[in-house]
């Protein structure tokens, strides 16, 4: 056991309630600027991507390969407590709290100056869809993803699970559609809007501009 670890065996412990709130309430995540990541692989990816670690929880009696020294707080959870705070039934024996990255549009300015291709998601509603799009964006070499007026929290547990690590690999920014368009225009981006129409141009036939913004509309439209 880590020499500075704290054993928590009661599900009524305030720290346990804090974790549960972060998992279940987007308002808690936003107000505290924190999110929960489960599983050794995902936690290690977050650390490697320079996400700021806050605390880690490990099941009592288990061993993990994560470098726990980077976490200011280390908790050892009883089986009962771990079952309470684990969002997924298949979670490996580690759960961690990280500070969420700055997703404000102001934080995107330096990146937009050097980016060549970005993706804009308009009003996305489903965590699974966002996770899948993030994976595709990483595979396609997209430089950043912008969420315009999203209906979901990008740092919710279902997005993190469905992104399978992609959330740590690509910069993400959130804002209203009009402001996002203003920022992109200031950096000379050309918009390309996706459309399921027989007269739409194939992506393989388009001569892409030097700075490209691909826009995906809402799922229901």
Model-predicted segments: where are they?
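Boundary-proximal intrinsically disordered activation/regulatory segments immediately upstream
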Residues: 4-62, 151-152
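Short acidic-hydrophobic, aromatic-tinged amphipathic segments that line or gate anion-handling sites
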Residues: 7-10, 75-78, 170-180
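Short, hydrophobic beta-strand segments that form beta-sheet elements in well-ordered domains
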Residues: 36, 54-60, 190-195, 214-217
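Alpha-helix capping/helix-boundary segments
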Residues: 41-43, 62-63, 81-82, 151-152, ...
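RNA substrate-binding interface of SAM-dependent RNA methyltransferases
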Residues: 48, 102-103, 107-203
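Active-site cofactor/substrate anionic-group-binding motifs, chiefly glycine-
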Residues: 52-80
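Glycine/small-residue-rich loop that forms an oxyanion/phosphate-binding "nest" at active or ligand-binding sites
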Residues: 71-99
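Active-site/ligand-binding-proximal alpha/beta "capping" segment
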Residues: 193-221
């Amino acid at each position: 056991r880590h020499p500075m670890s704290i054993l928590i065996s009661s599900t009524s412990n305030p720290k346990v309630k804090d974790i549960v709130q972060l998992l279940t309430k987007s308002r808690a995540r936003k107000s505290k600027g924190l999110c929960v990541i489960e599983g050794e692989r995902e936690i290690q990816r977050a650390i490697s991507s320079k996400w700021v670690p806050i605390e880690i929880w490990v099941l009592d009696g288990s061993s993990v390969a994560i470098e726990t020294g980077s976490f200011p707080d280390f908790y050892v959870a009883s089986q009962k407590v771990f079952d309470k705070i684990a969002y997924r039934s298949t979670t490996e024996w580690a759960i961690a709290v990280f500070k969420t990255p700055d997703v404000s549009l102001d934080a995107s300015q330096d990146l937009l100056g050097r980016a060549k291709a970005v993706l804009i998601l308009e009003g996305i509603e489903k965590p699974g869809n966002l996770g899948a799009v993030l994976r595709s964006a990483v595979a396609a070499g997209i430089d950043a993803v912008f969420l315009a007026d999203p209906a979901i929290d990008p740092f919710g547990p279902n997005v993190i699970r469905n992104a399978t690590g992609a959330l740590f690999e690509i910069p993400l920014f959130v804002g209203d559609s009009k402001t996002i368009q203003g920022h992109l225009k200031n950096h000379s981006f050309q918009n390309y809007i996706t459309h399921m129409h027989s007269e739409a141009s194939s992506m393989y036939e388009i001569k892409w501009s030097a700075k490209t913004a691909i826009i995906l509309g809402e799922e229901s439209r």
